[in-house]
């Protein structure tokens, strides 16, 4: 497990680690005063995507994590699983807060979830939502809506 993401919610430190030996799987470690107090392993379905800063979202006492093709919502500091929802056929790259809900950017789908993990709407394109050019974001929320770029720039 070499890829880690750290988040901070006073008085806790949260480490999310990719388990490269068993993808898509992440371990969540909760620390207080640099001592581990709890941990949990989350196992998603679908394909693997690397852990990065937008793979997790702190929302009050909730931690949302994109793992494989699912989003998991766990309660802090108990690490109790509140819900998990499949948001893409393949993999979920990121989750962002939007109004009182969440928007996920998957390889094949964009999904809006409510706070209970229920899908409010979803959108699929003709191709995968990734940009072949690094400088061009494939997914961007604007005041007018969501800008998307697929692999064919459509």
Model-derived regions: residue spans:
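Short loop/turn segments that connect beta-strands within beta-propeller blades
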Residues: 76-78, 114-118
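Sequence/structural signature of beta-propeller modules
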Residues: 1-47, 150-154
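Short beta-strand elements that form the blades of beta-propeller/WD-repeat-like
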Residues: 11-27, 56-67, 72, 98-106, ...
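A glycine-rich, hydrophobic loop/mini-helix early in the fold
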Residues: 37-83
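Repeated scaffold domains used in trafficking and secretory/extracellular systems
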Residues: 1-18, 46-60, 86-99, 125-142
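Generic "edge-of-domain/loop-turn" microfeature
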Residues: 35, 78, 90-92, 102, ...
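Aromatic (tryptophan-biased) beta-strands that constitute blades/sheets of beta-rich domains
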Residues: 29, 35-48, 81-86, 91, ...
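Short acidic/polar capping segments at secondary-structure boundaries
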Residues: 108-110, 117, 126-129, 145
